[in-house]
């Protein structure tokens, strides 16, 4: 009989419960939300993005999630999901948090030096996305220094953000997409 070429085989596979349960962390019965980590999101004018991040972080295992915003942005967060803490930004609010997510829904009205200060001073794991990535546009050297300084840093640029920061040739980007 003829065999199906590998290129034609499905790239989607059924994920079964047995496999899922093997990858999930095991917790004892005495664990509480305070033991599972606290994610802080710096929110902005587009509240939906920050709210999704806060909600999703709890869904994947964080015990607590907080969205910190400027006082004039609090009005965008009046009807947040139960379980999401909304607070006015202060440096003190960043203490004892495990993960910082900065960028989703931030908007362009934040002071760039203020955002950089938050990133540089935060001691935990950091995810930089969207508008916080755009702060480093045309600052390739600065982003490289940040990557070297912060060992637990994840950048999530889309293609346009990546091009604005790193200025790769179009051929290199196409090669990466083809390789993936």
Indicate residue ranges for each PLM-predicted region.
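Small-residue (G/A/S/T)-rich helix-start motifs and N-terminal tracts that mark the onset
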Residues: 1-127, 134-180
